[in-house]
Amino acid sequence: MAAKDVKFAGDARDRMLRGVDILANAVKVTLGPKGRNVVIEKSFGAPRITKDGVTVAKEIELEDKFENMGAQMLREVASKTNDLAGDGTTTATVLAQAIVREGAKAVAAGMNPMDLKRGIDTAVAAVIKDIEKRAKPVASSAEVAQVGTISANGDAAIGKMIAQAMQKVGNEGVITVEENKSLETEVDIVEGMKFDRGYLSPYFVTNAEKMTAELDDVYVLLHEKKLSGLQAMLPVLEAVVQSGRPLLIIAEDVEGEALATLVVNRLRGGLKVAAVKAPGFGDRRKAMLEDIAILTGGQLISDDLGMKLENVTIKMLGRAKKVVIDKENTTIVNGAGKKADIEARVGQIKAQIEETTSDYDREKLQERLAKLAGGVAVIRVGGATEIEVKEKKDRVEDALNATRAAVQEGIVPGGGVALLRAKKAVGRITNPNSDVQAGINIVLKALEAPVRQIAENAGVEGSLVVGKILEEKSETFGFDAQSEDYVDMVAKGIIDPAKVVRTALQDASSVAGLLVTTEAMVAELPKEAAPAMPAGGGMGGMGGMGF
């Protein structure tokens, strides 16, 4: 086992704080409408330019192992916020840095780290309650567009496109972002269905970079039961091979010999194939398979209908223009089903929704309805260069995630104002334990950090902006960094999804609390390079051997 280097107490916290500061300082320059770009070197090709906090955070790796541990724990804040809310990563990083800095000072002054953490947690719970109370539901398409515009760094065209896509496919519909071959950024609405089952084997993957299986102009075989052998299917498989088209198999399960045979055929290139489990369970699974059959214009191979696998012909298979499968989801685009059949099925599901008395059943029926009727919206991002397209795509994805979050939990005034206004709720909390109270005060101060940073990135003194906002009675009064003016944030359309603000604070306080309570750090000592082998000499004198 390699020797370890161990740091304790103040030394450990100082090194960790240096790492936190390096990562946070690189990320926080991107915050707000006047945030700056960060240029990231790539091992090959042109450097990447981004204003996306989590993209910057993921690229940072420090030489000093202890500093790097601090940086990586802060990176976790950005990643977690991105996974849960899809946006707000820079805000989360700024909040975490503010809490860690003040927390480290308090610990250095002799306060109990565990009591500080209790105070931090108490204050954060009060802020979250306050944000939930202030959140207003998103009522109109215009509000959706405003949320999208703010998250896309003030790009109104992106906000409008996302609102348009959500209007077409519904809030529950599927919206994907792709790169466009042309200069234009456009929205394309495609009929399609997405369900939460991924490929059964990674060997089905066709795009190694994205780890997805993409099949074009594909046949779809739907089977109600498990497939453990392929003998009965050989006639239909041969017909598919002769047609030269790929095949998607959706069944209760594909196991053992059947899966192995499909994988071998896929790797040898004989049959472009992918297999996924059927979505849902029990009767619901059968209903969803029937939905897919209607969408693709195929037939469900079911014992109830007296159908056997050996009797299946290629005409019984469904068809789709494209199928995309990743580790967790399958999306069927442009199924070949008849419009009249799909509409009849939609009508049938709507009737079931009206009749059902169970909330759970109603929710599941509505999910099926969204899948059948919703379709898929594709936002194709264009630009003059590859660098521009990638940067714009980052912003579109952020904006899309933010609008989804806004629809889920509502909106609050943007520009860090919601957190600043929550100071009132935290200020009402008192605790007899001075160390717990110090933890509450740490959060009280940290709530100012996002507004300060947005102002500083716009070249304005942060303290002045914070003071001016807090002087005003209006809850929606704030600083518009774009115009460098004080405005009613909601009226101006500067709004944040409540979910993004909540998640940013929760994740920031969670990781910051761990950093503040850290008392020792352990890292591997660098291995010394082994000495080089000595150069080999000759074989010495061979005399005395009697020759």
Swiss-Prot record:
Its transmembrane ranges are none
Q: What residues bind ATP, as annotated?
A: T30, L31, G32, P33, K51, D87, G88, T89, T90, T91, G415, D496
Query: Mind listing the GO molecular function terms for this protein?
Result: ATP binding; ATP-dependent protein folding chaperone; isomerase activity; unfolded protein binding
Which residues are in coiled coils? Answer: none
Q: Which InterPro entries match?
A: Chaperonin_Cpn60_CS, Cpn60/GroEL, Cpn60/GroEL/TCP-1, GroEL-like_apical_dom_sf, GROEL-like_equatorial_sf, TCP-1-like_intermed_sf
In terms of Gene3D superfamilies, this protein maps to:
GroEL (3.50.7.10), GroEL-like equatorial domain (1.10.560.10), TCP-1-like chaperonin intermediate domain (3.30.260.10)
Q: Which domain of life is it from?
A: Bacteria
Q: Where in the cell is it found?
A: Cytoplasm
Where it mainly occurs, coarsely classed, is cytoplasm
Keyword check for rRNA-binding = no
**CDD domains per the UniProt record, alphabetical:** GroEL
Keywords for this protein: ATP-binding, Chaperone, Cytoplasm, Isomerase, Nucleotide-binding
Q: Which Pfam families match?
A: Cpn60_TCP1 (PF00118)
What's this protein's family per the entry?
Belongs to the chaperonin (HSP60) family.
Under the subunit heading, UniProt states: Forms a cylinder of 14 subunits composed of two heptameric rings stacked back-to-back. Interacts with the co-chaperonin GroES.
HAMAP family for this protein: CH60
Q: What name goes with this protein?
A: Chaperonin GroEL 1
